[in-house]
């Protein structure tokens, strides 16, 4: 699978995917990344890709022209085009699964400043996606998160296939069961005896009974 990133900061993207499991997966040919510097398509000597807003307003918008040219440079390899934007649909595990199943390349357009000329969303992208109801400093962070969530679903990325099935968010409104490692007791805090028993049926039953429900009231702790 291939991930394209149209960005002002290619080094941020490259840095994230140059270590850990991501690096190993790329070296193994499980997926590949391609970063496109948006400024290369600015069309002006100052390499500016943003401009003021028609009708007035604070800040600057990314222009449609350089984004269009960057997409054209990818040809048929652009696949599904995703604009990361605060106004996009909230990304979740179900979307990650669907994107992986398509097998198509994914091309991410990262938003910056006040956002992107609306004609990009209207004419050039397949999906607008957000990480949630909050604003981050650059769309690159969202692009990386989405690509990471999809890439780790690819065959061979993780050693154990079962680990994908047991993860949080594969079950609606339910999180992963509690997990423990050595020592079996620390500071008076003990690992449940059933997990030390070696009885796989009992362990499985305990895990199912102790899957954590999503608690909507956690904000009260703040």
Curated annotation (Swiss-Prot):
Sorted alphabetically, which keywords does the UniProt record give?
Answer: Cytoplasm, Methyltransferase, S-adenosyl-L-methionine, Transferase, tRNA processing
Biological process terms in GO annotation: tRNA N1-guanine methylation
Q: Where in the cell is it found?
A: Cytoplasm
What's the superkingdom here?
A: Bacteria
Catalytic activity, per the record? guanosine(37) in tRNA + S-adenosyl-L-methionine = N(1)-methylguanosine(37) in tRNA + S-adenosyl-L-homocysteine + H(+)
Which cellular component appears as one GO term in the record? cytosol
Q: Which GO terms describe its molecular function?
A: tRNA (guanine(37)-N1)-methyltransferase activity
Pfam families reported in the protein's UniProt record: tRNA_m1G_MT
Q: What is its EC number?
A: 2.1.1.228
Q: Does the keyword Nucleotide-binding apply?
A: no
Residues where S-adenosyl-L-methionine binds: 111, 131-136
Query: Where is it mainly found?
Result: cytoplasm
Q: PANTHER family from the entry? A: TRNA (GUANINE-N(1)-)-METHYLTRANSFERASE (PTHR46417:SF1)
Question: Into which family does the record put it?
Answer: Belongs to the RNA methyltransferase TrmD family.
Complexes and interactors: Homodimer.
Question: Which purpose does this protein serve, as stated in its record?
Answer: Specifically methylates guanosine-37 in various tRNAs.
Can you say what this protein is called? tRNA (guanine-N(1)-)-methyltransferase
Which species is this UniProt entry from? Leptospira borgpetersenii serovar Hardjo-bovis (strain JB197)
Organism placement in taxonomy: Bacteria, Pseudomonadati, Spirochaetota, Spirochaetia, Leptospirales
Q: Which gene encodes it?
A: trmD
